[in-house]
Swiss-Prot record:
Residues 69-361 are cytoplasmic. One of its GO terms (cellular component) is membrane. PANTHER family: GENE 7073-RELATED (PTHR37340:SF1). Residues 1-17 form the signal peptide. This is Uncharacterized protein CXorf66 homolog. It comes from Bos taurus. Residues 95-197 are annotated as: Disordered. Residues 95-106 have a biased composition (Polar residues).
């Protein structure tokens, strides 16, 4: 607008200047050729100013109209977007109001029987389910935990042995058990240390017979000299360089380096009270014709042969007592055949004292 005002003022000023020149020329009747040229130049200037002012005015008007049109379009788009949002919110509010009024319809319109029946059915279906839903979620949380971690069955009570005995069995080493087996015990407590593994002889039952109890207090008296002490000493010296294996439960083995000296057995009621070494006696009846054909089993140990002669009508009982039951003890009773000789072959499994008692009645 300021530019338009300036152009108008400029045109007015130029026109006034031209009027003044014309008045001066009329006053002076004589005009020269130079003045005529000046008048033409001024006219050109006037025309140029008019053209420039017209172009400026038209440009300004066009720009203003463009700005107004753009601003109006943007405002219309903004108002249209606002109207759409308002319509969406109004529709949502109307739908929520309709649902809320439908839920409260039994209180407002009690006169409609159809609405009352539908509402009563909905209340019956939703009413009892609401208190049940809370424990159902809790049950869902509890059930998988109970399924994942089943209750372990209670361990059965041990009746076989008392707690102190079980602790002794756990903490006892094979050496200590073997040493305690050699200790003196009363007759009621004497039992095999390994009752689970019974020792069975490989010989037929026809060659075996039960041993009869001997009522002698000591198998070898103190005053009588030991006849074959040298053979026993040789055996003990030889045993020092041998490693004997002791049978143990669950595959345990004990290597014994030094054997104990010879101990005299003290027998009472077919059981030994001193030595409880496990042995397997084997008895074969060998006659004079079959002495050369004695069956020699394949043992890992050396077989010891003991010979005894028996007198007529005076039977003797030679029994090797060890850590075994009564059924495993074998003896030889020579009532009728006293002239024969007997070979006793023992399969030695652990450290034991081998000795020979000869007694002349």
């Amino acid at each position: 607008m300021n530019l338009f005002i300036y152009v108008l003022l400029l045109s007015i000023w130029t026109s006034s200047c031209l009027d003044r020149n014309e008045s001066n020329g009329s006053a002076t009747a004589v005009t020269t050729h130079a003045e005529f040229k000046q008048t033409k130049l001024q006219e050109l200037r006037r025309r140029l100013l008019i053209i420039v002012i017209g172009t400026l005015i038209t440009g300004y008007m066009v720009s203003c109209t463009c700005l107004l049109h753009y601003s109006c379009d943007s405002e219309e788009a903004h108002t249209a977007a606002k109207d759409k949002k308002e319509d969406i919110t109004i529709k949502a509010s109307r739908s929520s109001k309709i649902s809320f009024t439908d839920s409260k319809s039994p209180t407002a319109g009690l006169g409609d029987p159809e609405r009352q029946s539908v509402v009563s059915r909905i209340d019956k279906s939703s009413g009892p389910s609401s208190p049940r839903k809370v424990p159902s979620s809790a049950e869902k949380l509890v059930r998988p935990s109970s399924q994942k971690k089943p209750s372990k069955p209670s361990a059965p009570k041990k009746v076989l042995g008392s707690p102190p005995q079980e602790k002794l069995h756990r903490t006892r080493s094979p050496k200590k058990a073997h040493r305690q087996a050699h200790a003196h015990k009363p007759v009621s407590q004497v039992s095999p240390s390994y009752p689970e593994k019974a020792i069975k002889s490989t010989w037929p039952p026809s060659l075996q017979c039960r041993a009869k109890p001997t009522k002698t207090p000591l198998p070898y008296p103190k005053n009588q000299s030991f006849p074959e002490q040298s053979s026993v000493d040789k055996l003990t010296k030889r045993q020092r360089y041998l490693k004997l294996k002791c049978p143990a439960s669950a595959g345990r083995a004990e290597i014994l380096s030094r054997p104990h000296p010879v101990k005299f057995c003290r027998c009472y009621k077919e059981k030994c009270l001193v030595c409880r070494a496990v042995s397997e006696p084997f008895i074969t009846h060998v006659s004079d014709a079959n002495k050369k054909h004695v069956p020699v089993p394949l043992f890992s140990r050396e077989l010891k042969h003991f010979y005894k002669s028996y007198k007529k009508k005076q039977p003797k009982y030679n029994t090797l007592y060890g850590n075994m039951s009564d059924s495993d003890i074998t003896t030889y009773n020579s009532d009728g055949e006293s002239d024969r000789e007997v070979i006793i072959m023992c399969n030695i499994k652990c450290k034991e004292d081998i000795y020979k008692n000869s007694r002349n009645n």
